[in-house]
């Protein structure tokens, strides 16, 4: 019975150490996830500053958003792994607690048997006194029984001491398990906080994606307007060229008319001079 209890205590101790190691691992993974979340927040802040720059860098913002989404998925996976680890720790702690309950039940049974053994020893002692009163000739046998009784008492005392030590170790293990459970609960709480932060990061990413989509739509609109203006410019240039050719033709027509007018004026002056000369000749006659 004592060997079984010792083995069970060693197994419980190993289980406790494994639980502590897994709890520390969960805390380390949680810390790593928090650092990844902080890194994502810093990257988001950088992206928000870049989005305030110029619309010409929308392609770069789109690539940065893609990287941020990949990192967010990695952080979510880390958080999910940490939550699974915490759940595993909780299941492990529950199993250890159940094992402790069974050990306590076995200890209670052993203590009850020890009490029965002590009662049997007392009855044996009373029987020895009866035998001593009934027959002094059985002194040698009585001495042997007395030695056996002392050995039984010694064994009972040793068993009592070992059971007390087992009970004390069980109390210590229960305290360690309670502290481990508190650490696991704290890690679970941290994971919940990290999950909330990751939700906020996801919302920020969605907002940035919406802004990028908005800028993309504005860029398409600007390109369409530029195309329309370019077509209008080409049309205006064509009309300007046509107008220039028309003006050149009109200017040439005006020049021709002016030349013709000048020629008519010269012709008119010549005719006037001839008329004046004819009138003068007629006057002279």
UniProtKB/Swiss-Prot annotation:
Keywords annotated in UniProt: Acetylation, Actin-binding, Coiled coil, Cytoplasm, Cytoskeleton, Muscle protein, Phosphoprotein
Molecular function terms from GO: actin filament binding
Residue runs in coiled coils: 1-285
Positions carrying Phosphothreonine: 54, 109, 253, 283
Domain of life where this protein originates: Eukaryota
Keyword match Acetylation: yes
Modified residues (N-acetylmethionine): 2
Gene Ontology cellular component list: cleavage furrow; cortical cytoskeleton; cytoplasm; growth cone; neuron projection; podosome; stress fiber
Modified residues (Phosphotyrosine): 262
Keyword Acetylation carried by entry: yes
Modification type Phosphoserine: residues: 62, 88, 207, 216, 272, 284
InterPro entries per UniProt: Tropomyosin (IPR000533)
Record-linked Pfam families: Tropomyosin
Subunit description: Homodimer. Heterodimer of an alpha (TPM1, TPM3 or TPM4) and a beta (TPM2) chain. Interacts with TMOD1. Interacts with TNNT1.
Family note: Belongs to the tropomyosin family.
Entry domain remark: The molecule is in a coiled coil structure that is formed by 2 polypeptide chains. The sequence exhibits a prominent seven-residues periodicity.
Function: Binds to actin filaments in muscle and non-muscle cells. Plays a central role, in association with the troponin complex, in the calcium dependent regulation of vertebrate striated muscle contraction. Smooth muscle contraction is regulated by interaction with caldesmon. In non-muscle cells is implicated in stabilizing cytoskeleton actin filaments.
UniProt-recorded name of the protein: Tropomyosin alpha-3 chain
Source organism of the structure: Mus musculus
């Amino acid at each position: 019975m004592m060997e079984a209890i010792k083995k069970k205590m060693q197994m419980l101790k190993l289980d406790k150490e494994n639980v502590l190691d897994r709890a520390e691992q969960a805390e380390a993974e949680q810390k790593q996830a928090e650092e990844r979340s902080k890194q994502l927040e810093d990257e988001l802040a950088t992206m928000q500053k870049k989005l305030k720059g110029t619309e010409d860098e929308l392609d770069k913002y789109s690539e940065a958003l893609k990287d941020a989404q990949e990192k967010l998925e990695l952080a979510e996976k880390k958080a999910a792994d940490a939550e699974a680890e915490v759940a595993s720790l909780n299941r492990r702690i529950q199993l250890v607690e159940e094992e402790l309950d069974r050990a306590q039940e076995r200890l209670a049974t052993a203590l009850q048997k020890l009490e029965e053994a002590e009662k049997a020893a007392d009855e044996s002692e009373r029987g020895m006194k009866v035998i001593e009163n009934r027959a002094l000739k059985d002194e040698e046998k009585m001495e042997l029984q007395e030695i056996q009784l002392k050995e039984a008492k010694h064994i009972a005392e040793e068993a009592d001491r070992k059971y007390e030590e087992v009970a004390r170790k069980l109390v210590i293990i229960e305290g360690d398990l309670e502290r481990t459970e508190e650490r696991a609960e704290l890690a679970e709480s941290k994971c919940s906080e990290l999950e909330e932060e990751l939700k906020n990061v996801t919302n920020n990413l969605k907002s940035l994606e919406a802004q990028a989509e908005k800028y993309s739509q504005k860029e398409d609109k600007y390109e369409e307007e530029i195309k329309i203006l370019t077509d209008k410019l080409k049309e205006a240039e064509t009309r300007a060229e046509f107008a220039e050719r028309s003006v050149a033709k009109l200017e040439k027509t005006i020049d021709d008319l002016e030349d013709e007018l000048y020629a008519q004026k010269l012709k008119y002056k010549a005719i006037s001079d001839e008329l004046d000369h004819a009138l003068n000749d007629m006057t002279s006659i």
